[in-house]
Amino acid sequence: MLPSHKQTISQLLSDAVGTLLPEGTNRPEIVLERPKQAAHGDIACNVALQLAKPLGTNPRELANRIADGIRADARGQRLVSAVEIAGPGFINLRLSPTARTDVLAAVFAEGDRYGAADLHDGAPVLVEFVSANPTGPLHVGHGRQAALGDALAALLEWQGHKVHREFYYNDAGVQIHNLAVSVQARARGFKPGDTGWPEAAYNGDYIADIAADYLAGKTVRASDGEPVTGARDVENIEAIRRFAVTYLRNEQDIDLQAFGVKFDHYYLESSLYADGKVQQTVDALIAAGKTYEQEGALWLRTTDDGDDKDRVMRKSDGSYTYFVPDVAYHTTKWGRGFTQVINVQGSDHHGTIARVRAGLQGLDLGIPKGYPDYVLHKMVTVMKDGAEVKISKRAGSYVTVRDLIEWSNGDAESEAGVDTIRACVESGAPNWPGRFTRGRDAVRFFLLSRKADTEFVFDVDLALKQSDENPVYYVQYAHARICSVFEQWHAREGGDAASLAGADLAAVAGPEASPQAVALVQRIAAFPDMLADAARELAPHAVAFYLRDLAGDFHAFYNADRVLVDDDAVKRARLALLAATRQVLRNGLAVIGVSAPQKM
C-alpha cells in the first residue's frame, strides 16, 4: 500500500485500540502485514491477539470492538471497504476503490520519483564496492560486487541519502610486486611454463599485452591519475610496476564503463603509507595499550572486542598484515564525516570484519561497534554451452566481467574470440558503451537475481534467450509491450498518455475491476515500501524480485483484460493502469541500472 495509506491505517488502528485501553496505558506498536492468501483481504493485523491476555479479554471480541472503531471513523470509511475478523482474532482489512485510485494518482503525480522518499534528509553514506587489486582484469565476483554495490547506492539515494561511491585500490604489497615481476619476465621474452618463469607470476595474456606496450613506450592513464609512459627499461622494476598498475587500472575503468558504474572517488592503499596513516594508526593502538609483542611480532588484542583470537599486526620481518591498512583506511572514512559506511565484499573477507572493527574500537575515536556495515556475497559460477567455464584466455585463470558482458551481448565477434569492448575503445567509437546495453542489462539483472549470501550460477545461454525463462527479458518485455500498446492507441486515435492523469479509474480500481487489475494496482502500491525495506535491509536483490512479480502481474492483467476496447471509459482506465505500470517498471529498472527498452 502507499506509505501515506499505511501511516493513516496504522494510526486508525492505534486510535481504535486507544479507546479500549485503561487510562495511562501505552499503546502497542501496530504491525501491518499482507495476508498470505488474497481471499483474506489486503491488510492483516494481530493487535487484538497481542492485547487480549493483558486486558483479560477474548481476542475475537476485542477484534470486533476495534473493527467497530475503524468503521465509525471517517478515515476508515474512505480507505477501507470491509473489516473482517478471522481465526482467533486477526483483523483483516480490504482497501476501498478510493484507496486504489489514490495509488494510480500518486504514480501520475510523482512520475520518475514515484517510490522515492526523503527519510534521511541528505545524510551521507559511503558505499565501498568492487575494490579490486590492480593485478588483473575484473572477474565475475567483482561484477557481482559492482551490481550489488551500485544498486544498493541507488536504493539509499532513493531514500534520501547523499551517497558516496568509493573504490579502494590495494596497490601495495606482495601481489603488486608479483605483477611487476610477471610483466618483467614477459618483457624479457619468457612465457608461462618456461624455465625462469617466476613461480608466483600471473599467467594471463594480459601480462604479455602490458609488457608489449611498456616496451613500445605507450602511454596509459587511469581515470583519476596522471599519464604513465612505458620506460622500455626491462631492469627498472619500479617503472614496470607503475606502468602495469596504471595499465590495469585503465582496463578496469573500461570494464566499469561498459557496466555503467561510476565512482566518486578512487582511494589508493599506497597513499595510506605515503601519508603516514598506517604508521599513525599502529602508533595510536600501541599508545592505547591495545597491542603486545610476542615472538618478534606485534599483536592486536582483538579478543577484547569479540574476535576468537588476537591477530598479528606487524610480522617479525617488519611488514604489516593486510588488515592493518584496512583499519587505517576506515579511520579516513570516519574522519571524512561518513558515520554510515557499507562495504560490499566477497564472503572470503568474513574473517577480516572482527579485526577491522576491533582495531577501530581500540583507537577510541567514538566509532560505533558495528562500524562499518558489510554486505558479503558468495561466488559466481559461469555456465556456457551447457558446461561450466573456469578459464578465460584473457585472464588466464578466471572468467572476467568483460567476457560476461560480451557473451551476454550476443555479438558474433565476441563468440569468435574478439575483444569487442577493447576494439570499440581503440576505434574511438562514440557512446561505445551503448553497444553493450543488452549484455550489461543481462549481467546486472542476473547478478541481482539471488540474495548476495547465496551462490549463483550465471547461465550465458539463458541470458541470450528471448523468452519468459530469461528474467531480464521477461521484465523488459513487459515495458516494451506496454509501449507497443500506446503506439497502437496513438496510431488509431492520436492518444496521449499525458491525457490519462484525470481518467475515471472505476474499471480498474472500482468494485467491478477484475482480480488481475486489482492485483496489479496492489503491486504498484507496494513499490515504495519495497524500496524502503530493501534499503534498510541492504538487500538490492529485492528490487529484481519485485520487478519479476510486477511483470508477472502485468502479463496476467494484459491476458485477462483487453485494453483497446470500444468503451472509451474502460479503455482509458486500462490505459492509465498500463501507464502507471510502465512508470514503475522504468523506476525499478533505473534503481538497478538496467535499461527500459521501448522495443524488443
From Swiss-Prot:
UniProt superkingdom: Bacteria
Quaternary context: Monomer.
Entries under SUPFAM superfamilies matching the protein: Anticodon-binding domain of a subclass of class I aminoacyl-tRNA synthetases (SSF47323), Arginyl-tRNA synthetase (ArgRS), N-terminal 'additional' domain (SSF55190), Nucleotidylyl transferase (SSF52374)
GO molecular function, one term: arginine-tRNA ligase activity
Keywords of the record: Aminoacyl-tRNA synthetase, ATP-binding, Cytoplasm, Ligase, Nucleotide-binding, Protein biosynthesis
Record field: transmembrane: none
Motif ('HIGH' region): 132-142
GO biological process: arginyl-tRNA aminoacylation
GO cellular component: cytoplasm
HAMAP family found in the cross-reference section: Arg_tRNA_synth
Family statement: Belongs to the class-I aminoacyl-tRNA synthetase family.
Entry EC number(s): 6.1.1.19
Cellular localization per UniProt: Cytoplasm
Catalyzed reaction equations: tRNA(Arg) + L-arginine + ATP = L-arginyl-tRNA(Arg) + AMP + diphosphate
CDD domains: Anticodon_Ia_Arg, ArgRS_core
SMART domains, A to Z: Arg_tRNA_synt_N, DALR_1
Pfam families membership: Arg_tRNA_synt_N, DALR_1, tRNA-synt_1d
Protein name in UniProt: Arginine--tRNA ligase
